[in-house]
Amino acid sequence: MDVLGSIPALADGRLLRRETTTVTYLEPLALSAHPRLRCAFTTRHAGRSGQALNLSFDKGERPAVLAHRQHVLQALGLEQTTLCTVRQVHGNQVCIVDAAMLQRGLTGIAADALVTNLPWVALGVLVADCLPIVLYALDTPVIALVHAGRMGTYHRVAQHALEMIEQRFATPPAHIHAVLGPAIGACCYTLDRRAVGPFQDQFPTWEEFFIPHGPEHWAMDLLTANTLQLRAAGVPTEQIDTASICTACHKHDLYSHRAEGREAGRGMAIVALTSPARVSQ
């Protein structure tokens, strides 16, 4: 249970390395002992096979991607679950994954957050710099997975997910815990005024997560921006766990669109509820 080789004692040990012959992934320490949760942030490594672990159909051949996804689920003990993903559009739409939604299917649904209270249903978002946020409660069987890039952050997607959790599952933000996974850091994410301007107009606290970086340029801190939004929504600071890993700095272990360009593959954040005893389906 060590941290991924080339990533230094990363995030103060908040992520644990897990490896099989086909998958290498990072597990949040905060969730490693949770009896009803499985969670992973995949790396770009297909375990000890030496192959690349791309999980996006847009970036690889469908049979290979399907096999990679199944390997990840197997590594998490979720091989018989449904993996739910949506068409990510950098907005704030939230998809509630209930029995009716599973029956209809999620194909074509545009959203950047998924919420469910169903056991043995895995939620997944693709990432290659954007921030994955896992939301869960200790006293209520409900989980959410959020995809928060620059525009998702602008549209307050994490707050929308929290609102949906409270409305549909009567679980207020004060009862929610959050894990913020690997994402591009301010060290590697410089933006010009055109990109920063909307934040200046809509966020009175914008200077807390934009760092001046030369004339008319700023470095965006996605982790801080979303931490502030979670806190503003009512999630206690002590219930927010942040893994400060920059995907661009560690492009040899994690996918990074900013560092690699349009050809970058995609990793995935995955979270699922289990039940005390596995029931046959």
PLM region descriptions:
Residues M1-Q281:
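Active-site microenvironment for binding and transforming phosphate-containing groups
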